Amino acid sequence: MASIHPPVCDFGWPAPDFNLVNVDGRSLSRDQLMGEKGLLVMFICNHCPYVKAILPRLVADCRELNSLGINSVAIMSNDPTVYPEDGFEHMQKIATELHFPFAYLVDPSQQVAKSYGAVCTPDFFGFNSQGQLQYRGRFDESRKETASHSSRDLFHAMRGIAETGVGPAEQIASIGCSMKWLED
């Protein structure tokens, strides 16, 4: 399982639209999910140890961000034939068990992941209320294990975006498992 780093933030880049199916069966779009102060788009999956290491804290931070006007959405774009744990029924199970405060969408064609330029799980895209990219960085210093101390990089960046509409100038790239792309 290779560790992948995404590129740095391209400030002002517009959030691509999408319309994907949530674990509850509803189709949801970017515009439906946009919060009053912004939107956090998170590419995650169920099998990746980098995601597993942060998931309970990510859920808690997304709850807190929601109270600040930042909505969150998780998108699973991996090919589930590579890792069956990433299949839709497992997505439903984990979303229920952890009481996700955000939609968990499936991207079976992987077109949304490609339009965002997602390269790993987790991969975070923080947009302000105008849909302009302001953060593309890490959750915190956790890797495959939970860090003993959390700097809460993602939370602090998104809180700043809620307050000012602008992300931090200094951002540390996320690290995670490579996307599991469909065979051509």
Regions picked out by a protein language model, each given a short descriptive name:
Residues 1-171, 178-182:
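Chalcogenol-based redox active-site neighborhoods
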